[in-house]
A protein has these predicted regions:
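Conserved catalytic-core motifs of GNAT/GCN5-like acyltransferases
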Residues: 36-44, 112-114
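Short acidic/glycine-enriched loop/turn segments that link adjacent beta-strands
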Residues: 44-48, 116-120
């Protein structure tokens, strides 16, 4: 995400979609060419169950409340389904500091391990325009080795 000449914040990952039921939403998106990517997950810390789907557009994360959780209620009551944009970042703490200092973002959830990402940490912020952004700690295992191996021509 490049804003006003600032360095890129991270790589776009997905749009979070609040649902009253994943199965029904998945059927709707299947008609648009979307299919499940990976297994369903439960995140008890956030009070949600979810699944990622991919298709002709951006990756979507379909979420529904776990049990009596009210995590998604504000968006569902307002009729807003797509409620957050997610970006994978190399430096989660640095990105949060930048979001707070440059964008006056409010941290909604401090870094916490997320089952959806194999325990990698995530954090949520709200920008002044009330947009909710999720930052996902980059997958270090997928990054190139930064050891002191000699550079080959």
């Amino acid at each position: 995400m490049q804003i006003d000449g600032l360095p890129a914040i991270g790589t776009f990952h997905h749009i979070g979609v609040a649902t009253e039921g994943i199965a029904e939403a998945e059927g709707t998106y299947a008609a648009l060419g979307y299919a499940r990517e990976g297994d369903e997950f439960c995140d008890h810390a956030q009070g949600v169950r979810g699944v990622f789907i991919v298709g002709p557009g951006p990756r979507l994360e379909l979420l529904e409340a776990l049990g009596a959780s009210n995590t998604l209620d504000p968006w569902l009551r307002a009729g807003s389904r797509m409620y957050h944009l997610a970006f994978e970042v190399d430096d989660l703490d640095g990105t949060l500091a930048l979001a707070r200092s440059r964008f006056q973002a409010l941290v909604l959830r401090s870094p916490t391990p997320a089952p959806a990402f194999g325990g990698r940490h995530i954090a949520f912020v709200m920008l002044r325009n009330r947009a909710v952004i999720e930052f996902i700690e980059a997958d270090r295992s997928a990054m190139p080795d930064q050891s002191n191996e000699p550079v080959r021509p």
